[in-house]
Amino acid sequence: MCIPCFTTNPNMAAKCNACCGSRRGSCRGPQCIC
């Protein structure tokens, strides 16, 4: 879990990746998962 995310926002994937650092982040449900 990293930051809250919204699947309707096309920029969330990039924000999840940035929040997770080198690990690939993904937006699942209400949270970014690392």
Swiss-Prot record:
Free-text note regarding domains = The presence of a 'disulfide through disulfide knot' structurally defines this protein as a knottin.
State any GO CC term.
extracellular region
- Show which residues constitute the signal peptide: none
Q: From the Swiss-Prot or TrEMBL record, what is one GO molecular function term?
A: toxin activity
- Between which residues do disulfide bridges form? 2-19, 5-27, 16-32, 20-34
Q: Which InterPro entries match?
A: Scorpion_toxin-like_sf, Scorpion_toxinS_Cl_inh
Q: Could you tell me what this protein is called?
A: Chlorotoxin-like peptide AaCtx
Query: What remark does the entry add?
Result: Negative results: intracerebroventricular injection into mice does not induce neurotoxicity (up to 1 ug doses).
Query: Per the similarity annotation, which family is this?
Result: Belongs to the short scorpion toxin superfamily. Chloride channel inhibitor family.
One Pfam annotation reads Toxin_5
The record's tissue-specificity note reads: Expressed by the venom gland.
Instruction: State the function annotated in the UniProt record.
Output: Toxin with unknown function in healthy organisms. On glioma cells, interacts with chloride channels (probably ClC-3/CLCN3) and MMP2 at the surface of glioma cells. This complex is then internalized via caveolae, thus inhibiting the chloride channels necessary for cell shrinkage and tumor propagation. Inhibits migration and invasion of U87 glioma cells expressing CLCN3/ClC-3 voltage-gated chloride channels.
Provide the primary localization.
secreted
Location in the cell reads: Secreted
Identify the keywords attached in UniProt to this record, alphabetized: Chloride channel impairing toxin, Disulfide bond, Ion channel impairing toxin, Knottin, Secreted, Toxin, Voltage-gated chloride channel impairing toxin
